[in-house]
Regions:
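Hydrophobic alpha-helical segments and helix pairs
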Residues: 72-128
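Beta-propeller domains
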Residues: 9-39, 61-66
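Conserved beta-strand positions in repeat-built beta-propeller and related beta-rich domains
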Residues: 8-9, 14-20, 56-62, 100-110, ...
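A short beta-strand motif characteristic of beta-propeller blades
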Residues: 32-38, 75-82, 123-130, 171-178, ...
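A short loop-to-beta-strand structural motif that recurs across blades of beta-propeller domains
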Residues: 23-25, 63-65, 114-117, 156-158, ...
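Short loop/turn segments immediately following beta-strands, especially the blade-tip
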Residues: 160-168, 211-213
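Flexible "stalk/tail and boundary" regions
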Residues: 54, 69, 117-123, 142, ...
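Beta-rich, blade/repeat-based domains predominating
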Residues: 1-11, 40-56, 82-99, 128-147, ...
Length: 225
């Protein structure tokens, strides 16, 4: 499956992953090439790593690694020692000030078994939210004082006040509750106007939501699910 599409500004390439088959794809438009980087375990997310040359951060099943796209070497940065074998990482994002936020879910997608973790700059790992379903897309507004977070199992996008000094979050409200007929909200990004662009699994498109009103603004259809 194609997940975690991430543009790498310094490297001028697009990365995405096949989670279950452990493949990282690298598309370089200037060369017109697609390279495959294969791993013996699942990969769930890609995070740009500013100032580290050809290295990117990859979320694996139960750890984060720093991977060099050119040398094809990696080193483990942090492990999740608390994870049950039936749990795995899911969508992960870096906040504007550099913390890594990581969703953890049950491999069978059982509701209520998911969690949201924060990895601080000193690589300390802190559980932030429990009893989640399928933690997914995470974004921040331009000011950096609001975090929006998708729980796919509950088909909602929640809004949190965000303290960039401490990394603390405070629940404000459910910004968007996605109707069943629109499918399941999955990965998410935010544009310059503060609108949320959300890929909907089973909804055949990317949906644009206003977090301030909770209303659907636009929909971009696709032929896939």
């Amino acid at each position: 499956t194609g997940e975690a599409a991430t543009w790498m500004p310094g490297l001028e390439c697009l990365l995405w992953v096949d989670i279950d088959n452990g493949i990282l794809y690298q598309y370089t438009p200037d060369e017109g090439t697609v390279k495959e980087h294969t791993f013996p375990e699942m990969i769930t997310s890609v995070i740009p790593w500013k100032g580290h040359g050809d290295e990117v951060l990859l979320a694996m099943k139960n750890r984060f690694i720093a991977y060099d796209l050119e040398k094809k070497t990696y080193k483990t940065l942090i492990e999740f020692p608390c994870l049950h074998p039936q749990w795995r990482t899911n969508d992960c994002k870096a906040s504007p000030e550099g913390r890594i936020w990581c969703g953890v879910m049950h491999c069978s997608e059982h509701n209520g078994n998911g969690s949201l973790y924060c990895v601080d700059n000193d690589l300390s790992l802190t559980p932030v939210l429990g009893q989640q379903s399928i933690p997914n897309g995470i974004v921040w507004n331009r000011k950096g004082d609001r975090m929006y977070y998708v729980d796919s199992g509950r088909r909602c996008i929640e809004e949190y006040a965000y303290d960039y000094l401490t990394g603390a979050i405070y629940f404000i409200r459910t910004a968007v509750q996605v109707p069943v007929e629109y499918g399941v909200p999955d990965g998410m990004t935010i544009d310059a106007n503060g609108l949320l662009w959300v890929a909907h699994w089973g909804g055949f498109g990317v949906y644009v939501w206003s977090p301030s009103t909770g209303q659907l603004v636009d929909k971009n259809r696709s032929s896939g699910s």
